[in-house]
Amino acid sequence: MAKTLAEKVWDAHVVRKGDGAGANAQPDLLFIDLHLVHEVTSPQAFEGLRLAGRPLRRPDLTIATEDHNTPTLDIDKPIADLTSRTQIQTLRNNCAEFGVRLHSLGDAEQGIVHVVGPQLGLTQPGMTVVCGDSHTSTHGAFGALAMGIGTSEVEHVMATQTLSLKPFKTMAINVEGTLRPGVTAKDIILAVIAKIGTGGGQGYVLEYRGSAIRALSMDARMTICNMSIEAGARAGMVAPDETTYAYMQGRPHAPEGADWDAAVEYWNTLKTDDDATFDVEVDLDADTLEPFVTWGTNPGQGVSLSQAVPSPEDFGDENAKAAAERALQYMGLEAGTPMKDIRVDTVFLGSCTNSRIEDLRAAADIIRGREKDPKVRMLVVPGSARVRLEAEAEGLDRVFKDFGAEWRFAGCSMCLGMNPDQLEPGERCASTSNRNFEGRQGKGGRTHLVSPVVAAATAVRGTLSSPSDLDPAPASAAIRTDAA
């Protein structure tokens, strides 16, 4: 029987088969290969184990890092916020008690959990990966079936190394063509979400396919899979290939020698069969894609940067019209305003979507030798301590500092309002993160989701801008099209 990539990985992990479809059907029981843990969604799960007198079933398949609440300045000092400090210390205590490997603040491998897993070679093709975080879909870039789970499910995986799930439907996102200079993976996924909506992928695993996807680097593929959840999907995947293997080989937890050869032989089978059928297929033309930016308060409210803020009257559906009216009011925007006329106060380069080394390189290439708009504050937050060290070895930190940007330590930072890096009410931010909800970056903060190169160009001009808007514009060869 012909199978999709998602179906192959799913079937390989079924411990106990359910009893079919339907609302009352029993789910399948899946084995979980890798469980990623952080400080926010794990305390209750560890406490559940403790109260039940249960051990952690597989400490060797569990890894923790501190990311959501960690400060990105003065990391050698006590954390000022009591709640954040308590959550961090609780994670440390729990990991010590249950034997979980932990990368703490100050550790060379500390960072955002979805950056740390891949960089250590823990995330591998064909795996099932879970974490108490919705952006676990990031790891699907390796051909893994990776899902965010709730705290009760976190406890279940800790206790049993399994998870009960009903099979998902499958959706192919076919992206053919060649991206133009200044158009990146972030623009692909923002365009996908704008096309199918924030609920279009509900109940599906999305598989990203086509020539434009195959041309992308692993960092870029992770950007796309990361935001699958913003389309409502449970997971996003890309079939592994030579690009995947080149990224993985030599990483600390990647197979070696004969084990590597055997692994690659298996990984090469992890592709959708030619005669397999998806439940839904969506097509996107990479040749015509432009830099994308959100104007509203959900990731589906986006347009090409060359366009204007839409009018609520442009939406035929009454619910969409009402949502647009509320979004415009919250964002302080008027319909018809050219997106490139919108001035920002802050530019944030970071998050599990766009904080990897290629993201930093791409942004640095745009700003090198230029001056920052004096009214704009720019924060650059590497996704991990390892990425930070790599960037500093390449001199990227000096490029950002010379430009006038703040060079920070690793963490989730301004992606979400759970640490000191937050927007003030009414402050407008061009952000490389994944969510632009009301208050996401701080109470009353206004967020526009953009790619790293758009973020960099915006920091130069002070208004939402693409690299081609700069004077002089960067040479086409200097703008990466395979990056995130």
Swiss-Prot record:
Q: Does the keyword Metal-binding apply?
A: yes
A biological process from GO: L-leucine biosynthetic process
Catalyzed reaction equations: (2R,3S)-3-isopropylmalate = (2S)-2-isopropylmalate
| Listed pathway(s) | Amino-acid biosynthesis; L-leucine biosynthesis; L-leucine from 3-methyl-2-oxobutanoate: step 2/4
The cofactor named in the record is:
[4Fe-4S] cluster
Query: Keywords of this protein's UniProt record, alphabetized?
Result: 4Fe-4S, Amino-acid biosynthesis, Branched-chain amino acid biosynthesis, Iron, Iron-sulfur, Leucine biosynthesis, Lyase, Metal-binding
- Locate the compositionally biased regions of type Low complexity: 464-478
GO terms for MF: 3-isopropylmalate dehydratase activity; 4 iron, 4 sulfur cluster binding; metal ion binding
Q: Which domain of life is it from?
A: Bacteria
Q: How is the cofactor bound?
A: Binds 1 [4Fe-4S] cluster per subunit.
Q: Where is this region: Disordered?
A: 463-484
Q: Where, in this chain's numbering, is [4Fe-4S] cluster bound?
A: C352, C412, C415
Q: CDD domains under this entry?
A: IPMI (cd01583)
Cite the EC number: 4.2.1.33
* Quaternary assembly: Heterodimer of LeuC and LeuD.
Q: What does this protein do?
A: Catalyzes the isomerization between 2-isopropylmalate and 3-isopropylmalate, via the formation of 2-isopropylmaleate.
* Family per similarity comment: Belongs to the aconitase/IPM isomerase family. LeuC type 1 subfamily.
The record, for PANTHER family, names: 3-ISOPROPYLMALATE DEHYDRATASE, HOMOACONITASE, MITOCHONDRIAL-RELATED
Q: What is this protein called?
A: 3-isopropylmalate dehydratase large subunit
Tell me the organism: Pseudarthrobacter chlorophenolicus (strain ATCC 700700 / DSM 12829 / CIP 107037 / JCM 12360 / KCTC 9906 / NCIMB 13794 / A6) (Arthrobacter chlorophenolicus)
Taxonomy-wise, where does this protein's organism fall, top ranks first? Bacteria, Bacillati, Actinomycetota, Actinomycetes, Micrococcales
